[in-house]
Swiss-Prot record:
Organism taxonomic ancestry: Archaea, Methanobacteriati, Methanobacteriota, Stenosarchaea group, Methanomicrobia
Function according to Swiss-Prot or TrEMBL: Catalyzes the ultimate step of the pyrrolysine biosynthesis pathway by converting the isopeptide (3R)-3-methyl-D-ornithyl-N(6)-L-lysine to the 22nd proteinogenic amino acid. Is able to use surrogate substrates such as (3R)-D-ornithyl-N(6)-L-lysine in vitro.
Pathways per UniProt: Amino-acid biosynthesis; L-pyrrolysine biosynthesis
Family membership: Belongs to the PylD family.
Species this protein is from: Methanosarcina barkeri (strain Fusaro / DSM 804)
Reactions catalysed: (3R)-3-methyl-D-ornithyl-N(6)-L-lysine + NAD(+) = L-pyrrolysine + NH4(+) + NADH + 2 H(+)
EC number: 1.4.1.-
Binding residue positions for L-pyrrolysine: L8, V57, I64, A107
GO MF terms, alphabetically ordered: oxidoreductase activity
Name listed for the protein in its UniProt record: Pyrrolysine synthase
Length: 263
């Protein structure tokens, strides 16, 4: 049976521009680069105001309120020339192509994709999100070692963990699903993390749809926590106590990763 994505709600996307600006500042403070700079470094690509057609999709649970408008705001923020089609689904796709879209953005319950019609490149949100959040974590300027804790090894976390392994980090991984943990251990050679014998980390990447997955025992002072997970992986109390550098935003960072990956 196909696994659905964790779905955003309209409340997650309120004030998306403000959320994105805040995240951009946080990323720059942690890495020395803004989100666009991270994307350029990660993919070696540059934006030239490509025209992006955003197509609403009604299948499954239907259109998420604010989703298309949020994608429009996000793509504009990163310098793309975007528009939302009047029609959804196949009619919307046709409309986008007829109106000169070079890149299509569209999502149903299982897949959020970017498709560059000029070069044929296609990107899925889940791996792109995992990779960019892992990349941000890996660039933490104040990291005290190459040890990284990855919590969540599913469709977002596994690609992020793989990216960190490829960058020669020593990756400790944990997932409540033992099958996912065993797969990551076997395929990536990561070190299984045992919550009963914790250690502290200055770099943490989290990718789960669960709240408060990061226990106090793994937090070091001023560590970075890079997480696309909703709800937030850490309590406000622990974040304040350890002055955690939190990188968390619902949609924009992953979308930027998708777009730059298909340029």
């Amino acid at each position: 049976m196909a696994i659905k994505m964790a779905l955003l709600t309209p409340d997650d996307l309120i004030n998306i521009n403000m959320q994105l600006q805040k995240a951009d500042s946080a990323v720059q403070e942690v890495t020395g680069l803004d989100i666009k700079g991270i994307c350029k470094a990660l993919y070696g690509t540059f934006s030239s105001s490509e025209k992006v057609g955003i197509v609403p999709v009604t299948s499954g649970n239907g259109i998420i309120g604010n989703f298309s408008a949020s994608l429009h705001a996000i793509t504009q923020y990163f310098g793309f020339d975007s528009f939302v089609t009047d029609m959804p689904d196949v009619s919307g796709y046709y409309e986008a192509v007829q109106n000169g879209a070079e890149i299509i953005l569209m999502a149903d319950d299982r897949t959020f994709l970017a498709h560059n019609l000029k070069n044929g490149k296609m990107a899925n949100n889940q791996p792109c999100t995992g990779i960019i959040y892992a990349e941000i974590a890996s660039r933490y300027l104040k990291a005290d070692s190459k040890d990284v804790l990855v919590v969540g090894l599913g469709k977002v976390g596994f690609p992020g963990a793989e990216h960190l392994v490829q960058k020669d980090f020593r990756v400790y991984g944990y997932d409540a699903d033992e099958t996912l943990l065993e797969r990551a251990t076997s395929n990536l050679g990561i070190i299984p993390f045992d919550p009963a014998n914790p250690k502290k980390f200055s770099i943490i990447f989290e990718a789960t749809p669960c709240a408060n997955t990061i226990p106090e025992a793994v937090l070091s002072e001023n560590c970075v926590l890079s997480t696309p997970g909703i709800p937030c992986a850490i309590s406000e109390e622990l974040r304040d106590k350890y002055e955690v550098q939190l990188i968390a935003e619902p949609l924009g960072i992953g979308t930027a990763s998708m777009l730059y990956s298909v340029l």
